[in-house]
Amino acid sequence: MQVILLDKVAHLGSVGDQVTVKSGFARNFLIPQGKAVMATAANIAHFEARRAELEAKAAEALAAAQARAAKIAEIAAVSVSATAGDDGRLFGSISAKDIADALTAAGVAVAKSEVRLGEGPLRTTGEHEVKVHLHPEVNAAVTVNVVAE
């Protein structure tokens, strides 16, 4: 199925690209999320009329993500406390939601879906490097210091 992308989609393309995707991916994800429209003659003409508006919106989103990444770089580290045993292992774990809440409390609004924990939830005390994926082109890193209560 041919679609026109209205937003940058990872591993697929950027604003305005006409791409061929599987029908289910288009019908169940791209079109309902507002990331694409079917590539009909009417939609192509409508898109060309709105191209500048959509590109400006994409540039604005990129600038906002870069500003948030700069704020995260200023913070550099956040501290999260949890109950732990004598050997440093936590009773439970620190999830992406806990890290997002700590970053939001530090002054940068971050959603839990933007926090990337490469090896799953944090289960030990100490410092851990965590990546924050703010935009397809913007990533930031923050150090999470897990402290025992």
Swiss-Prot record:
TM region(s), chain numbering: none
Record's keyword terms, sorted: Ribonucleoprotein, Ribosomal protein, RNA-binding, rRNA-binding
Keyword Amino-acid biosynthesis among record annotations: no
Signal peptide as annotated in the record: none
Domain of life: Bacteria
GO CC terms in record: ribonucleoprotein complex; ribosome
Any one GO biological process: translation
Keyword field contains Protease: no
InterPro entries: Ribosomal_bL9, Ribosomal_bL9/RNase_H1_N, Ribosomal_bL9_bac/chp, Ribosomal_bL9_C, Ribosomal_bL9_C_sf, Ribosomal_bL9_N, Ribosomal_bL9_N_sf
SUPFAM superfamilies linked to this entry: L9 N-domain-like (SSF55658), Ribosomal protein L9 C-domain (SSF55653)
GO molecular function, one term: structural constituent of ribosome
Pfam families tied to this protein: Ribosomal_L9_C (PF03948), Ribosomal_L9_N (PF01281)
Function field: Binds to the 23S rRNA.
Record HAMAP family: Ribosomal_bL9
Family membership: Belongs to the bacterial ribosomal protein bL9 family.
Name of the featured protein: Large ribosomal subunit protein bL9
Organism of provenance: Actinobacillus pleuropneumoniae serotype 3 (strain JL03)
